[in-house]
Amino acid sequence: MAVIDIGLQQVAVERFAVRNAFTISRGAKTFVDVVMCVVTDGIFIGRGEGTPIYYHGETAEGCAAAIEALVQAQGGVPDRETLRTLMPPGAARNALDCALWDLEAARTGKPVWALAGLKAPQPVRTAYTISLDTPEKMAQAAADARARGFTLLKCKLTGDGDQARIEAVRQGAPDVDLIVDANESWADLDVQAQARALADLGVALIEQPLPAQADAALAGLALPVPICADESCQSLDDLARLGAYQAINIKLDKAGGLTEALAMAHAARAAGKRIMVGCMLASSLGIAPAFLLAQFADWVDLDGALLLAHDREGAMNVASGYLSPGTLWGEAIITDAQRS
């Protein structure tokens, strides 16, 4: 078993307030708890952040405990590939995996994009999420987002009254590109009829219309809008059964880290799938690793830190709807003393 000379310096639960309530079909959130870990070789450190997948029953406290238990059992922090065999996909593994990438960048003096064999990242257009609300409030939120420079909006839907919501959003921001996320809420609806109505309003992508266990109901449907798997696509093992979907949403917290997410992206391309890179509510430390995947994604939805009331220092930057990396993760050689 490959255990390298890396220890766990810190694991902590941190809370970030959400600027406005973040509402989807499953409820509203006014804050998010994340798990943040720091790994070290005694000279350099690496940091990673994970947001628990609450619909899987994860909690930040549980993730922190899982990280501590793994490191104690192994006598140190295992390397990334070994970590994939020891810990299931989820926020805990994501935090550790990304911390290991960050540490390697510091130790080698090479940015993570170079270590991963990628090109230097460029700014990417990110979607901005319009929370589920009344048509009037969603229209105003869309107009506000457009005034801030966002040209790609992602609207949260719930099944009942969705067409009226998108019609209102179109009035509020007539020139934006639109994608929608049903968060599994269309179980009692005619998916084809819903998709046709939204296609007429210029919707370019529909995320997760049905519950994950109902994927078979999508098979054979001729839809005018591509369908993207989110809750149905957690990790690499899920790809083989997603024939009814034209796209997948890769989130590092679902996949369990950048290592798995990169493997998923390559496998998805080989299978002819289009790629969305998404995120949970998170600080820029949690978003930064996904920025590398965004470089070759068809849709980018990395607004998780933009929805917070306050972010970390060195946060990612956004201008005219385009996201640029900050200085939090994966770039410079930073010693323990420099970062403390």
Spell out what each predicted region is.
Residues 1-2, 277:
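N-terminal short leaders/motifs
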Residues 305:
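Active-site cofactor/co-catalyst pockets and adjacent glycine-rich loops in catalytic enzymes
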Residues 298-301:
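Short helix/strand-capping turn motifs
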Residues 155, 160-295, 309-321:
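Catalytic core of soluble alpha/beta enzymes
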